Amino acid sequence: MNLEELRARKGFICDMDGVIYLGNQLLPGVAEFVTWLNENDKRFLFLTNSSERSPKELQQKLQRMGLDIGEEHFYTSALATAAFLKKQAPGCTAFVIGAPGLLNALYDVGVTMNDVDPDYVIVGETASYNYEVITKAVRLVLNGARLIATNSDLTGPTEFGIAPACRSLVAPIELATGKKAYFMGKPNPLMMRTGLQLLGVHSEEAAMVGDRMDTDVIAGMESGLATVLVLSG
């Protein structure tokens, strides 16, 4: 695909970490790209595997960097996890290892927090991760709770270097229990289908922009989108 064919796409789905920003630093060319999207009436969605922040918090983060983008342009793996449970297990209970972005998304769809006998153990990115939490999760999974992780990223980029991401956090629980987690974020096709639905475009009308071959590019290719790999992450 050449550049003109890419420019002709109606919709653009973009990763965030390593594509739009690195930590709290906006990456070069992003402001111009967003201006081009708006001036050419392109439909666009920032689709992040991170589950830490809500769309409102992501909007505010970009606003602090000088980008004024509506809250409706953000979709996270936390929202994808919540939507999955709302459809597959309405009224379920969960023990959650995660940040407020994940907890609030689950609460909004009626998931009840339960650290005694939950239906699910759900793992997302969080700084509040310790041996006690791992032990609790392991015992709950061994007692029958199903294991879900918000995404399969092993690491994530920051302005200080690489940091452990969700798959690194769920791995000890998998190893100790012998159970494999079900990963919700990219490249899970459920998340990509939701992204296309939110944009209101078909896969052949959209492009995926990301910095990871194992999630962003694979997600785009498997869903029939044109893919763009950037090397900024």
Where do the protein language model's features map onto the residues?
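HAD-like aspartate-dependent phosphatase fold
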Residues: M1-M16, I20-G233
